[in-house]
């Protein structure tokens, strides 16, 4: 059986923690920021942990746990 391929876009955007969690950046922080309040922009700065619902999908995109 051939090797599974890593999704190259996912490799650039998703990091895998030591415990196996997937960490991504929030979207909506690059432009049109004047209408967003300070609290919202500060929350968008922080990394987001992928929920259990999407964890299986992320494992398919990164079969070898790349992105560390």
Curated annotation (Swiss-Prot):
GO terms for cellular component: cytosolic large ribosomal subunit. Transmembrane segments: none annotated. Pfam families: Ribosomal_L35p. InterPro entries: Ribosomal_bL35, Ribosomal_bL35-like, Ribosomal_bL35_CS, Ribosomal_bL35_sf. One of its GO terms (molecular function) is structural constituent of ribosome. PROSITE patterns: RIBOSOMAL_L35. Keywords: Ribonucleoprotein, Ribosomal protein. PANTHER family: 54S RIBOSOMAL PROTEIN BL35M, LARGE RIBOSOMAL SUBUNIT PROTEIN BL35M. Belongs to the bacterial ribosomal protein bL35 family. This is Large ribosomal subunit protein bL35. It comes from Fusobacterium nucleatum subsp. nucleatum (strain ATCC 25586 / DSM 15643 / BCRC 10681 / CIP 101130 / JCM 8532 / KCTC 2640 / LMG 13131 / VPI 4355). The gene is rpmI.
